[in-house]
Amino acid sequence: MKITPIHDNILVSLVESNKEEVSQKGIITALANPDKNESAHKGTVVALGAGPAYGKSEKPKYAFGIGDTIYFKEYSGISFEEEGTKYKIISLEDVLAFEKHGNTKTTTVKKGAKKK
């Protein structure tokens, strides 16, 4: 991934819902069109912006890190797709909640740092 978020923006890969439905006879079928409200507002953190938000002087302090799951407002950010994966870039202001997944890195990307 060559995209690095700036300011207090966050790059997330969207988490798709794997919702299943069970028929009266016990047959499990995956829904062709999962409920948008259950899948479109959740993502895994891929990268964190390192700069301050517009009009602010302090760099953001994230309570979550790369690899954690965040929940965000429905119409926040911009969406795009790369190599079959759906991504979204959102502002820290639009994050509503998060789930920690073990020992994740919560620091920001350092200015001028080279990505592998």
From Swiss-Prot:
Pfam family, one: Cpn10
Predominant location: cytoplasm
Region forming the signal peptide: none
Assigned keywords, A-Z: Chaperone, Cytoplasm
GO molecular function: ATP binding; protein folding chaperone
GO cellular component: cytoplasm
Subcellular location: Cytoplasm
HAMAP family: CH10
Assembly with partners or alone: Heptamer of 7 subunits arranged in a ring. Interacts with the chaperonin GroEL.
Family: Belongs to the GroES chaperonin family.
Role: Together with the chaperonin GroEL, plays an essential role in assisting protein folding. The GroEL-GroES system forms a nano-cage that allows encapsulation of the non-native substrate proteins and provides a physical environment optimized to promote and accelerate protein folding. GroES binds to the apical surface of the GroEL ring, thereby capping the opening of the GroEL channel.
Identification of the protein by name: Co-chaperonin GroES
Native source species: Mycoplasma pneumoniae (strain ATCC 29342 / M129 / Subtype 1)
Lineage: Bacteria, Bacillati, Mycoplasmatota, Mycoplasmoidales, Mycoplasmoidaceae
Gene: groES
